[in-house]
A protein has these predicted regions:
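A hydrophobic, multi-pass inner-membrane permease signature
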Residues: 1-268
Length: 268
């Protein structure tokens, strides 16, 4: 009975999960009349007018928006992995006063809403004169309480004998950290993907810090939803479809690494 019930339940969950994405993709070829017609799944014709309008440059340079978002999310994810992994390594293997206090401070940062810190981050960036460019926005998100706690737990599972062996050989803690990075590569992939997803959909801080000609994807999607533009609904849906493609490709490429990290986390 369980062998029969499990595939049916799995298929039902997959169908429910995939339906919104399938509807959004098919609706990107529809007219407004077809979109608002109840029960209509397939378009009358697969006319890619919405995609042509996006890449025509009449609304904004969508290619530049896509590349800008990729650079921002990818760069911030890489630097966030390095910074939070180094902090987690220090908290897990270092011996200094205040280590426990720093760990609990990282936990409190997770509980504090990021939206409430946006104005403080903007003021900090303004004083450093790094507003209005991607590098300043990238720098503002590299420190994460979630990443610190995650990598602290990851490095606690690394045997202390490896650290002691490196010390016997006269290696510095900095060198030890980079030596251990290949051992935690699945964890790096997992957190990197998570941080990429979070940065990919960040809206408030880019809205505060970037110029109007430096749109990221969330800002571009919000601009398409502005009623003053009078764009067809299919254009916004087409932009949403294109915005999801990098996420699917990234997760599909690193899926095995993520699964390995999650399995190790559950076992431990």
């Amino acid at each position: 009975m369980n062998r029969l019930f499990s595939p049916i339940l799995t298929g039902l969950v997959l169908l429910i999960t995939a339906y919104p994405f399938a509807w959004m993709f098919l609706s990107s070829f529809k007219t407004n009349r077809e979109i608002y017609q109840p029960g209509k799944m397939l378009p009358e014709s697969f006319d890619p007018f919405a995609y042509k309008l996006l890449f025509s440059g009449e609304l904004f340079d969508f290619t530049a928006v896509l590349v800008r978002s990729l650079l921002l999310a990818g760069g911030q994810a890489i630097f966030a992995c390095l910074v939070t992994a180094a902090t987690g390594f220090a908290l897990a293997k270092g011996r200094f006063r205040g280590k426990t206090l720093l760990f609990w401070a990282a936990l409190l940062i997770i509980l504090y809403p990021k939206q409430a810190m946006s104005l403080a981050l903007f003021e900090w960036m303004a004083r450093l004169e790094i507003t209005g460019n991607l590098y300043g926005l990238m720098l503002s998100g590299v420190a994460s309480g979630l990443g610190v706690i995650f990598f602290t737990q990851v490095f606690r599972k690394v045997p202390d004998e490896l650290i002691d062996l490196a010390k016997v050989e006269g290696q510095s803690p900095f060198f030890c950290f980079f030596t251990l990075l290949p051992l935690i590569f699945p964890a790096l992939c997992t957190y990197g993907i998570l941080h990429f997803f979070l940065c990919w959909q960040e809206h408030l801080l880019p809205l505060l810090t970037l110029r109007t000609d430096q749109l990221t994807l969330p800002l571009a999607l919000a601009k398409l939803g502005d009623s003053s533009y009078h764009t067809p609904e299919a254009v916004g849906l087409a932009a949403g479809v294109l915005a999801m493609i990098p996420l699917f490709l990234l997760f599909g490429y690193f899926f095995r690494r993520v699964r390995t990290a999650l399995a190790d986390w559950v076992v431990s």
